[in-house]
Amino acid sequence: MANVADTKLYDILGVPPGASENELKKAYRKLAKEYHPDKNPNAGDKFKEISFAYEVLSNPEKRELYDRYGEQGLREGSGGGGGMDDIFSHIFGGGLFGFMGNQSRSRNGRRRGEDMMHPLKVSLEDLYNGKTTKLQLSKNVLCSACSGQGGKSGAVQKCSACRGRGVRIMIRQLAPGMVQQMQSVCSDCNGEGEVINEKDRCKKCEGKKVIKEVKILEVHVDKGMKHGQRITFTGEADQAPGVEPGDIVLLLQEKEHEVFQRDGNDLHMTYKIGLVEALCGFQFTFKHLDGRQIVVKYPPGKVIEPGCVRVVRGEGMPQYRNPFEKGDLYIKFDVQFPENNWINPDKLSELEDLLPSRPEVPNIIGETEEVELQEFDSTRGSGGGQRREAYNDSSDEESSSHHGPGVQCAHQ
């Protein structure tokens, strides 16, 4: 006998774990004929078990998962599917697909309703300071007039079209001895499995068993919460007879801020300064997310390079559930250089005397050729990738024949 983790599906088909593909097919055909709903109307569940077992064991990938890991292998390797929860629960004593979707079974065995997911847009200020807000939602609740029965006592009858199952099973023959089972929601009862005569229906809910109700939730957005974090209201989703209500889940969506960008518990911002500030020190003020006016000072003599980053410790976002601890604030400096010809040429020599001296120009031996640096617009590209140099003696006619500007430095 092959060494497998579980044999329940093999036992359903009555074959050993090492059964070949032909043996599986032969066993399935025999059992499918015996328990076909047309031949044996009371064996619908048994037919589902047989079909499920054959579907798994006839698929090499699913069979390998099942052989190696048993139920757990199918649990983790399956993508889930509607209507399969009852089959797997009957075979293995537990749901396979319930945990994969929004609908499952609760601990007390009752079917669990779907969760209701709602986006909640919040500002960065809300996430920094915390916020309490009210959210109005519309949901289904059990009708109080009929206690969720849909009509007076005894008026509810089992749907004869689907025999109370809520679904209709259709069998399609693929080949002699091989059939495919398909199921769809019963149109007579809309999947309820029950019908109520129109004269006996509840006047308040019109036989629907539930009515719409407006629910107002008080939502607490705690300090330090993040984009994508969830706030859950357990059991507050739609109600339905015989079903445990699911949860209302609010998904936080952080709105873009005009000054700050968030990275975990840290904040980032960009600040523009002039050349004189970069060289001679500066002071500036900005408004933080809690309304405080923060003064930033940088001493004269300490140079700020273009694009450099400095940090202010402890001025980032508060930590979730530990709001007295905060991340850091990172400030990137955009140094704005003066425009061309901003100073009188006579003053340039005075400025040069104040700045660090130039590096010495090395002596060049041999012939040289002088070229001119021109302005370059990086958004226009480099002229189709052609390697060209802008020479000082280029004529207007020659320039117009080129496909774009020459290689130049970006103007600041």
UniProtKB/Swiss-Prot annotation:
Residues modified to Phosphoserine: S78, S123, S394, S395
Q: Where in the cell is it found?
A: Membrane
In terms of PROSITE patterns, this protein maps to: DNAJ_1, DNAJ_2, ZF_CR
Keywords of the record, alphabetical order, are:
Acetylation, Chaperone, Isopeptide bond, Lipoprotein, Membrane, Metal-binding, Methylation, Phosphoprotein, Prenylation, Repeat, Ubl conjugation, Zinc, Zinc-finger
Residues at which Zn(2+) 1 binds: C143, C146, C202, C205
Instruction: Mark the residues carrying the PTM Phosphotyrosine.
Output: Y391
Outline the segment boundaries, as ranges, of region: Disordered. 365-412
Q: Where is this cross-link: Glycyl lysine isopeptide (Lys-Gly) (interchain with G-Cter in SUMO2)?
A: K134
Can you give the residue ranges of the J domain?
A: 8-70
What membrane topology is given?
A: Lipid-anchor
Q: Which residues form the signal peptide?
A: none
**ZnF start-end (CR-type):** 130-214
Q: Which SUPFAM superfamilies match?
A: Chaperone J-domain, DnaJ/Hsp40 cysteine-rich domain, HSP40/DnaJ peptide-binding domain
- Chain positions with Cysteine methyl ester modification: C409
GO CC list: cytoplasm; cytosol; extracellular exosome; membrane
- Sequence positions bearing N6-acetyllysine: K39, K152
Instruction: Provide the binding site for Zn(2+) 2.
Output: C159, C162, C186, C189
- List, alphabetically, the Pfam families matched: DnaJ, DnaJ_C, DnaJ_CXXCXGXG
SMART domains associated with the record: DnaJ (SM00271)
Molecular-function annotations in GO: ATP binding; ATPase activator activity; Hsp70 protein binding; protein-folding chaperone binding; unfolded protein binding; zinc ion binding
Mark the CXXCXGXG motif repeats by their residue spans. Answer: 143-150, 159-166, 186-193, 202-209
Positions the record marks as coiled coil are none
Q: What does this protein do?
A: Co-chaperone of Hsc70. Stimulates ATP hydrolysis and the folding of unfolded proteins mediated by HSPA1A/B (in vitro).
Protein name per Swiss-Prot or TrEMBL = DnaJ homolog subfamily A member 2
Q: Which gene encodes it?
A: DNAJA2
